[in-house]
Structure formats: C-alpha cells, structure tokens
C-alpha cells in the first residue's frame, strides 16, 4: 500500500505532461534499420569482437564514430560504411577493477579538459564516463591507445552506498565556461565538472528525488540515467534504480525526461511515464528525418523502442516504425546520435548502439527514413 501511494504521488506531480501524450500520439513514421557492426558473425555487415554492449557514441564534425564498449572496457571507431578504422582505446580503471565499464562519451572541441602523460599535455578529444565512477580523456597525441584517468570517484560514499556509477555524459558551455555533466545513477544526481575536471556542483529533480516507488530500505527512486545537450540545454532521462542503485528497473512507464539549464535549474518536465521505459539515448532530429523531422527522439533501454516528442511541448508523437508498420525494437538499445555528413554518415541517419542478449553482445547500426 505504501508503494502504491508513492507511485500515485509521482503520477500527480507529472499529470499535466501526461495528458497530451495520449491525445497527441500519431502513427509512427516509417524507417529502415541497417546493422553495421556486431561482435557476432553473420549479424551485421562487419564483425568486431571488441563491440560488446556498446553505449555512448559521438563524433567530431567530420570524423568517425567513437563508441564506448561497456563489455570490453574499450572504445572503438567506425565509419558509417566500415568496421573499426583505428586501434581500440583502452579506458582506465580505478584501483581493484580489472576491466572498465564505459558508458557515455562526448567529443570535446574546446581547449579545456587537458590530460597529461610523460610530459605531454593536450586537451581531450573524447571524454568517457564509466560505471566504475571514473571520467577519462583521450587524445592520441598523449597516448594513442589509452585514455587518461581524470576523475576517480569510485571510493566516494553517500547514503550507505560507495562508488559513483556514471551512466551518461554531456558537455555544455555557458558564460562561466565549459563544463561536463555526468549522471551519477547511484547517488541520484547529475554531477557538474569544470574545465579542469573538478567537481563543482550536483543537482537533480527534487520532485522525483522525494518520491520513491519502492520505499525499501534501501529506497529505489528515479535517478538521472542518460543525458544530452540539445540547444544549449541539458535533457536528462530518469530511470528506476534497483536495490543496489547500480542498474535500472525496466517496465512500461518507468521513465521521465527533464530539461535543465547549465546551472542545474529545472526548466521543465519534458516527458513523463507513458511509453517511456528506462530511456537512455537522446537526439534532436534534423529537418529531413521523415515523419519525425525536428523532433526529439528518445530510445528505451527497457523495450528497445524509439519515441518521438515535440521539441517545444514534449507531446508524445509516436514511435519509429519499420516498413511493415511495426514499431522498431532494438534489444538492449543505448546510444542514439545523427551522422555528421562526413565519416560518421548522413546527417539524416540515426545511428544507434545496443547491448543485446542481456548486454552480452553488441550492435552498432543505422536507421534512415524510407
């Protein structure tokens, strides 16, 4: 009974965003999925055994994809038409951990977030978060095959739990400078780091933080899960914590999306429950992405479906469908991002990463409008 009351409180808080979801839903747009790389043979165009449970994916303005391989502790590079094109990058671990578990990653175009090794110092080209509670930077001029540890919060304790669990990563700028934002799923906050990798603030949605569907102990609440910078604002997904606050608990309606400014102020509740099911990947579609052009797309890890929302109102518009009118469902869906018009593919093609078969395997692929 107590759990039911807590759930009702959450629903009441987000009642207004929920109403237009059903009323505004459209039939999903038609799209074609193409499997590009997998760790398994005969599953995609190319095979790469390093691609196990890939999460985040990012690219430079004209470069290839950088993909975080959670299952192998690596980051691998792919173009839109080929398998790995450069040596894999090893993500560092904290003490006592054998293999890193990278999650979100971002491309860094700034001169900040400098890393150093053997008297060589350069700004990170790519930055990686991990479930081990670390953040690392990579620049081939510092080390061609290893990222450099910059943040280690693996031993930090809070509310009876030890070790940050970073699920997502975003980079955003404000008048105060350039900052990294990491979703710490274990502690239920978004952590903000300055240009020198110093932790300067943390924030969350106080409504969700004070309403936990499973009272515990320990209490299981909705915590920041995925994160993406869209139009200079931070879009943050929330998923339900498991008992040890490490993994999500999937299920229909288990998800929210909020929008924050770079100072951590909640701007609005963007999307709530409905078709959300442990949402993680987020992207803003371009003007030539078919039915869902210019809309925000959010991928569910829980059921592999991709939801589309009006970018202004957050109204649910439908889910991406294949040519037969069936909802596209990608088992273990994680990252979503559009190409760059260069080595990372067409700008109107949505690329994805997924850890299918309960995260035991990996898939990197593309979805384009028919």
Question: What are the residue ranges of the model-derived segments?
Answer:
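Bacterial N-terminal signal peptides
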Residues: 9-20
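Sequence/structural signature of beta-propeller domains
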Residues: 26-370
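Bacterial N-terminal signal peptides that target proteins for export
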Residues: 1-11
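Signal peptide processing junction and immediate N-terminal pro/mature segment
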Residues: 21-25
């Amino acid at each position: 009974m107590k759990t039911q009351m807590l759930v009702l409180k959450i629903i009441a808080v987000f009642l207004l965003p929920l109403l237009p979801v059903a009323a505004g839903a459209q039939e999903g747009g038609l799209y074609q999925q193409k499997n590009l790389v997998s760790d398994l043979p005969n599953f995609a165009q190319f095979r790469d055994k390093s691609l196990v449970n890939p999460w985040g994916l990012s690219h430079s303005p004209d470069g290839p994809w950088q993909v975080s391989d959670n299952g192998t502790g690596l980051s691998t590079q792919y173009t839109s038409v080929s398998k790995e094109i450069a040596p894999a990058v090893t993500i560092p671990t904290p003490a006592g951990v054998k293999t890193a578990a990278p999650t979100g990653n971002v491309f860094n175009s700034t001169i900040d977030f400098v890393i150093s090794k053997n008297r060589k110092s350069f700004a990170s080209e790519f930055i990686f978060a991990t479930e081990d509670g670390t953040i690392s930077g990579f620049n081939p001029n510092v080390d061609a095959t290893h990222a450099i540890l910059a943040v280690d919060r693996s031993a930090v304790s809070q509310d009876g739990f030890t070790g940050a669990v970073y699920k997502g990563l975003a980079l955003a700028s404000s008048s105060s400078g350039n900052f990294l934002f990491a979703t710490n799923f274990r502690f239920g906050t978004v952590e903000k780091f300055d240009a020198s990798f110093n932790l300067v603030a943390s924030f969350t949605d106080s409504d969700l933080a004070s309403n936990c569907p499973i009272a515990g102990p320990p209490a299981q609440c909705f915590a920041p899960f995925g994160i993406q910078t869209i139009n200079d604002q931070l879009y943050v997904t929330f998923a339900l914590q498991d008992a040890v606050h490490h993994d999500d608990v999937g299920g229909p309606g288990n998800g929210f999306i909020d929008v924050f400014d770079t100072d951590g102020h909640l701007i609005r509740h963007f999307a709530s429950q409905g078709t959300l099911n442990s949402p993680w990947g987020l992207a803003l579609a371009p003007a030539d992405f078919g039915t869902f052009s210019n809309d925000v797309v959010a991928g569910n890890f829980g059921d592999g479906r991709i939801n589309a929302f009006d970018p202004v109102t957050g109204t649910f518009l439908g889910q991406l469908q294949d040519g037969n009118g069936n909802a596209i469902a990608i088992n273990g869906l994680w990252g979503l991002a559009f190409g760059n018009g260069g080595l990372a593919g067409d700008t109107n093609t949505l690329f994805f990463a997924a850890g299918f078969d309960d995260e035991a395997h990996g898939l990197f692929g593309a979805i384009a409008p028919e």
